[in-house]
Design a protein with these regions (language model features):
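FIC/Doc superfamily catalytic core
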Residues: 1-187
Length: 187
């Protein structure tokens, strides 16, 4: 016959175990995404094919100018260092044999976030500009907000994705884009 103390410990263990199982279940997508990332098997899911808005160098620079006017910044904020920003905008529409390399809105947005963050096209504000253009692109394509009006990408998620890209190795570009697209598909 089990001792009363052991029964109480087992009951607590069972409650703690169930609580942990519930938490893990609630975070299953995040844990599965991390596992897929670790094993280099992330795939692109749930994306929006229909693009309503086409980003150009000119309309992107107008958006950046609006950011600068509204939020200010240093004298160097948003000053282009070279032509790499123009290249970044063009690259999200790159094709091979007439087939887009980034066919979905989410892939283009993720690539835009990646390229503007990594290319350091501006003297100051690259991460802020990249995050703003990411949101701008999603907004203009009608997918920044959920049907109920809530944010599709939480503030903390945007910061995390941008910093993750900034700290990533160039050879991890494809995986970073997949992570961003997967997070957007789930949010």
């Amino acid at each position: 016959m089990p001792k009363k103390g052991n029964y109480m410990q087992n009951e607590k263990f069972d409650k703690d175990t169930q609580l942990l199982v519930d938490v893990v279940t609630d975070y299953a997508f995040a844990l599965d995404t991390l596992d897929d990332y670790d094993h280099q098997r992330l795939v692109l899911r749930k994306s929006t094919a229909a693009e309503k808005f086409h980003a150009t160098y000119e309309n992107a620079m107008a958006a950046i100018q609006g950011l600068k006017e509204k939020f200010g910044g240093s004298e160097l904020f948003a000053n282009e260092k070279d032509d790499s920003f123009k290249s970044s905008i063009g690259q999200i529409y790159q094709t091979v044999g007439g087939v887009e390399l980034y066919p979905s809105v989410e892939q283009k947005a993720a690539m835009l976030l990646y390229l503007v963050t990594k290319n350091h096209s501006f003297s100051d504000g690259n991460k802020r500009i990249a995050a703003t253009l990411f949101l701008w692109f999603l907004l203009n394509n009608g997918i920044l907000y959920k049907d109920d009006g809530s944010k599709r990408v939480a503030d903390a998620t945007l910061v995390t994705m941008t910093l993750m890209i900034a700290e990533s190795r160039p050879e991890d570009m494809e995986m970073m884009v997949k992570v961003v697209v997967n997070l957007m598909g789930r949010l």
